[in-house]
Amino acid sequence: MHLSLDTMNMVDDSCLSPGNFPEMVKGGMAAIGNRVHSIDVILGFTKDQGPTLLNPGANTLTVPQKVEVESLGQLGKQDHPTHPYGQLPLRDSSEQPAFHGTLDTEIFSNKCESELGEVRKVSDSDRKSPEQGDEEQPKKKHRRNRTTFTTYQLHELERAFEKSHYPDVYSREELAMKVNLPEVRVQVWFQNRRAKWRRQEKMDASAVKLHDSPMLSFNRPPMHTNVGPMSNSLPLDPWLTSPLTSTTPVHSIPGFMGPSQGLQAGYPGHGFLNTPQSMGQSMQPMAPPPYQCPAVFTDKYPLEDTNQRSSSIASLRMKAKEHIQSMDKTWQPM
């Protein structure tokens, strides 16, 4: 059940020189009579892994494979520092015993076989991404130049738009040949022009609605509807008050006097002062317009000025009569 001294010495030597693993296995097998269960117990191997111990070099990787695994592992570490297997060191047979290297390489190869394809895909995509970006950049930069219309072209297009807002294909083709433009450009111009026309129509409609909306009415005191004889007193707005007091009766104002009281007998009266009584009564059911000032006539001159004016008119008439009489006397026959 115990190993011989030769076997232990060979195990110690194998720890120092892993290349002597086959000789160590052969010596141990010869010494213990092909009984390797103690080593299996120490290393934790099962009976199914016995052939692996007997033939340790069967599943080991070759030198090119090791180089490829190391290079891919370095790429995975550089490209993906958070890779779950990126921190696993690659073991070599020169650092540890051969059986440890065999098991570690088997585990690492089995676990990384599924990851190698992903690493290769990532590396290929990283290599191809700059080229694809260079190919996609010209596509993004490619943009159609804006069409600059001349004055003649715009004039012809506007004339055609006045005739019809929706010209057919034949009309557009004829117009395109006339103005030396592609038919597609003409079609796009008509689309833009119709959109502009619709916006203008909406603006005009909104302006008309604002213009037709009722204006705000002024808050005025209620007015009496009985516009009868001129002697009736009418309520005056505070901003229309005359220098006279509001308690002054209307018939005392010179403007509301009758034609016989305010004028002399020889001076003809005006028509608006000779309004009959029946006409004033017929105006009773009529109401004044909503935005019209009340019919209140205020004289600009005081009462003294009116008296002086009437007296001056009378004196002028007297002077005229005297002058006519004097002229008649001078033209009498001698």
UniProtKB/Swiss-Prot annotation:
It is found in: Nucleus. This is Retinal homeobox protein Rx1. Keywords: Developmental protein, DNA-binding, Homeobox, Nucleus, Transcription, Transcription regulation. Plays a critical role in eye formation by regulating the initial specification of retinal cells and/or their subsequent proliferation. Its main location: nucleus. GO terms for biological process: positive regulation of transcription by RNA polymerase II. Belongs to the paired homeobox family. Bicoid subfamily. Residues 76-97, 118-147 are annotated as: Disordered. A motif (Octapeptide motif) lies at residues 37-44. Residues 142-201 bind DNA. A motif (OAR) lies at residues 311-324. GO terms for cellular component: nucleus. The lineage of its organism: Eukaryota, Metazoa, Chordata, Craniata, Vertebrata. Disulfide bonds: none annotated. It holds the Pfam family OAR. Residues 118-131 have a biased composition (Basic and acidic residues). It comes from the Eukaryota. Gene3D superfamilies: Homeodomain-like (1.10.10.60). GO terms for molecular function: DNA-binding transcription factor activity, RNA polymerase II-specific; RNA polymerase II cis-regulatory region sequence-specific DNA binding. A motif (Nuclear localization signal) lies at residues 317-321.
